[in-house]
Amino acid sequence: MKTKITSLLGASIIASTSLAQVSPVISSWLRNTTGITGRHYVSGNSTPINDSYLANVQSVKYSTNFVYVSCTGIPSYVIGPYLDGNPNQGGNNSNIYKIPLVPVANTGSLSPTTGGTIGVFINGVSLFDYRDGVSWKSSTSSLCGGPIMPPCTGDGVWNRDAVVAERAGFDCAKGHPAMTNYHHHQNPSAFNLDLTVISSICNLYASDALYVINSSVHSPIIGYAYDGFPIYGAYGYKNADGSGGIVRMKSSFSLRSITTRNTLYTSTATVTPGPAVSTTYPLGYFKEDYQYVPTTTLTPDYLDIHNGRFCVTPEYPLGTYCYFATVDANHNSAYPYVVGPTFYGVKNVSKVTSITETTTTYTGSATTSLQTINLDAAINIYPNPSADLIMIQSKELLSHDLKVELSNLTGQIVAKKDFYQGSTICYFETTGLYNGTYFLTIIDNGIKKSFKVIINN
């Protein structure tokens, strides 16, 4: 079966890349065409600070075999603060990613994911796997390792899950920095947009993150893994052939039924013990608390051991292997989160210091505009009637800036905002406005669309 899938995969990708200018691995990147720079919060100040370095992707170039993505590693959405004491702040990392046009399935020994960058999101931000470099040290009955606990080294048997253990240190967009390398370990949607909100960070430090989960449509490509295969958001077609409707793609990993940590799910042999399961170290605190239950033909919406599957997607109508950013029914991140614990393909994406072959620069036109999207379906304005705040949410990533104006019944403009490229949310504070009817107008190069809103403070 794997041979058949591999051959189909190769055919589909070759078909999709025969015209390189329309290949998703070239056209999916969020290029900075407006000069937008990064922004960040510091603790105690909910007004974003403008940074000097550019956000998103600066250029996309391609050759016969590779795509080169140049980026700072900084998104256009506001990042920070990190309330667990993390002293770092994201900065310009001057990355050039070299990605194969045709990724290759690994038919030999699988490559495990590692610490550090294991993929790149479409805005140039790094993807990390579950880990934070901390593990249990049995001889001292304590956690060791990671950037904040050197030079202590753990046993490397019970490895801490950053998504669980470092939640207090994630910003509203579910990211944080390692030195200047801002990154996500998990589905990059904002905490306050989850169906069950498990962090209050967005209350003071709002950010829209990379994309908004929409359960009614197939999620977009949100990145590429270090084996060159695409990463999608949380939702896809139920069946691999594109049938069955839109469903949440589910992880095939589940928590083990254990109270002591002295074995791994792959064997009954005793290993160096970790701490007993407790409120301090609950199930899920360590990666080894999970077990993999293989999916079957009866559960096509459950993913394989790499957190992906071969399937049809909107961008790959002939099919491709792809990963999904998994969430649970409450839209909270679900292990193994994006990619892992091993890659499906040959790990062949790299960072390079320069481009040493002849390339073509991709200059594809922006596609997300008032001319190309149905605003009534793609824009959500809430709450309406509004008290304190009006949120404008786009279900698609904006590929260029829009202007937004709020005016009263006499036509007087009472507030203006920029809806930035790469954003999905823009908002107005309304506490200083009189109650009544207003019009919210979105403007794109002279084309306007207005919505009626009610303010009732």
Residue ranges and their predicted role:
Residues 227-229, 234-353:
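Extended, compositionally biased non-globular segments
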Residues 360-376:
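Low-complexity, Pro/Thr/Ser/Gly/Ala-rich linker/spacer regions in secreted
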Residues 123-125, 178-191, 316-332:
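Extracellular/lumenal glycan-associated surfaces
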Residues 1-22, 370:
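Bacterial Sec-dependent N-terminal signal peptides
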Residues 132, 137, 145-207, 226-227, ...:
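Core of folded catalytic or high-affinity ligand/protein-binding domains
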